[in-house]
């Protein structure tokens, strides 16, 4: 299934990103460990979640479900929220590497300065008050907000960008990234 904007699938366990991000201060890379190293962001295993939740959350129905999956040695069948077509290869690591670090906010990225600049449209997804000419420090976990939105403030994860080819091509153009077909279609 493909979900529209401002909606997402029902999940087998209601996972509160708000609790983990806002209250506990965890960032995306704590659970999605491969996002800055590999093509995929990876969903943490039941065993990974139980590392904390074997002792935390005794009064929670959702954590009881998690513990049941663990006891039965069953993976959680999470429903995918963000999806690109099968013929598209999106490499998370390359995008994290490109967008993270100290960046000068510009209207359009200069091809010769791609490692030190970020387009205003992308910067304001991370820092809503960003302005052209400012230097911002973009953490790896903040890069996720460019395409996924502020998941840390979502009680239920939903898609906030179309993730269609035109959206990707526009972002590549704004950031002087390659736009030839084989960049994403191989």
Feature names for model-found ranges:
Residues 1-9:
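Post-cleavage N-terminal segment of exported redox proteins
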Residues 10-59, 88, 93-186:
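Sequence context surrounding c-type heme c attachment/ligation sites in exported
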Residues 44-84:
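Structured, soluble extracytoplasmic/luminal domains of envelope-associated proteins
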């Amino acid at each position: 299934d493909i979900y529209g904007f401002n909606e997402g699938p029902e999940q087998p366990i209601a996972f509160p990103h708000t609790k983990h991000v806002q209250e506990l201060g965890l960032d995306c890379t704590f659970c999605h460990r491969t996002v800055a190293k590999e093509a995929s962001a990876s969903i943490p295993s039941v065993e990974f979640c139980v590392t904390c939740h074997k002792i935390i959350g005794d009064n929670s129905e959702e954590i009881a479900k998690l513990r049941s999956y663990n006891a039965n040695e069953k993976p959680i069948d999470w429903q995918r929220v963000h999806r690109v077509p099968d013929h598209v290869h999106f490499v998370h690591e390359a995008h994290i590497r490109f967008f993270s670090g100290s960046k000068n906010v510009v209207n359009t990225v200069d091809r010769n300065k791609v490692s030190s600049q970020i387009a205003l449209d992308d910067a304001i997804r991370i820092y809503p008050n960003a302005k052209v000419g400012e230097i911002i420090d973009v953490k790896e976990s903040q890069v996720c907000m460019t395409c996924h939105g502020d998941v840390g403030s979502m009680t239920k994860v939903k898609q906030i960008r179309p993730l269609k080819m035109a959206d990707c091509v526009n972002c590549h153009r704004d950031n002087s990234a390659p736009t030839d077909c084989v960049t994403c279609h191989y």
